[in-house]
């Protein structure tokens, strides 16, 4: 997928708040959250500050009004609360090092985390949806504890290189994209295909892997509808939130 510079398509601060708020609520609905941990962010112009959830809030409690703005040093420049340590170091490093990464989603969802915990932790191309991730995933095979230092965030950014998705061994996943809609769409399908791959492996049968040449042929077909599909998907789930969680507007 073509890389874009996030700041060329940077929405307003209010628009950023709305989008990142919605993604937190939806992550809770889909069971991607991990108590008060895990973190999503949106960069502000220049990449020196970003919107993030205040530490201690559940994803189901996030509203636009209780998001905080944090700078590269962890100082809160708007809002009330603190930033979780790994949220600061992971997101600050990637926002600064990847100008295309307007939105970053870092989570430990069940099936992607299962894959990250396997000796062979690489996603196999076993069905049509897995091809969405053909040659798009970086695999970080270093786990040395919590990401609570600046150099660990920088190491993660380097390991991610130019990929939008990175699976962290024994840990979880980070998704980075120029828009919230694209990041959410990627995460939705990544967790889905990891679940499907888990079912294939658990069945005891041998996975039938799609040949690389077929994957390369199919990728452009998926790219044609990628941006529209990402936008329509987010719009559809926003309608669900409006019907069933009206307090999310706060």
Name these PLM-found stretches.
Residues 1-15, 20:
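Single conserved hydrophobic/aromatic residue that forms the stacking wall/gate
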Residues 16-17, 21-250:
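Glycine-rich flexible loops
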């Amino acid at each position: 997928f073509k890389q874009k510079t996030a700041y060329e398509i940077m929405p307003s601060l209010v628009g950023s708040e709305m989008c990142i708020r919605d993604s937190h609520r939806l992550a809770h609905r889909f069971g991607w959250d991990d108590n008060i941990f895990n973190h999503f962010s949106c960069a502000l112009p220049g990449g020196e500050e970003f919107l993030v959830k205040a530490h201690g809030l559940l994803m189901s409690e996030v509203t636009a009004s209780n998001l905080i703005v944090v700078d590269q040093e962890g100082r809160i420049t708007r809002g009330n609360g603190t930033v979780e340590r790994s949220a600061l170091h992971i997101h600050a490093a990637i926002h600064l090092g990847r100008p295309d990464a307007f939105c970053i989603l870092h989570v430990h969802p069940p099936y992607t985390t299962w894959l990250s915990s396997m000796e062979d932790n690489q996603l196999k191309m076993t069905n049509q949806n897995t091809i969405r991730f053909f040659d798009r995933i970086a695999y970080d095979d270093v786990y040395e504890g919590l990401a609570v230092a600046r150099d660990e965030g920088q190491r993660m950014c380097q390991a991610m290189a130019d990929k939008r998705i990175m699976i962290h061994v024994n840990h979880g996943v980070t998704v980075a994209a120029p828009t919230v809609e694209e990041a959410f769409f990627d995460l939705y399908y990544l967790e889905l295909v990891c679940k499907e791959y888990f079912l294939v492996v658990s069945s005891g049968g041998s996975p039938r892997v799609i040949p690389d040449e077929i994957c390369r042929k199919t990728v452009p077909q998926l790219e044609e509808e990628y941006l529209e599909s990402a936008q329509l998907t987010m719009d559809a789930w926003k309608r669900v939130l409006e019907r069933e969680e009206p307090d999310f507007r706060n």
